[in-house]
């Protein structure tokens, strides 16, 4: 009987891990509307890039990333912070769709309608857009 209960508890633990989510609280402290794109590891070999999340000036709202297990493997790009990166910040290049909402699980290197941008590693579950 104890074996059945232990197996059921272990099974529930595995099911809950497969439906992991990361919640990021975002606040736009700029005077303009800003868009965010996210690049995150979904398993040991795959990355997902998705966007655009639009935040009006002064807006604060969460982003929920489904199927992401670890917030330490999340990178963010903001179109309001182009080329403004601290030398100490870890960065990663990836391709984003220029004008439309997207969710890509395969790299889109040099495809028409995509541009390469520099993502910054997310350091906590809060992200503040500043000029």
Ranges and model annotations:
Residues 4-16:
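Sec-dependent N-terminal signal peptides
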Residues 18-29, 33-68, 75-131:
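Intrinsically disordered, low-complexity segments enriched in small/polar residues
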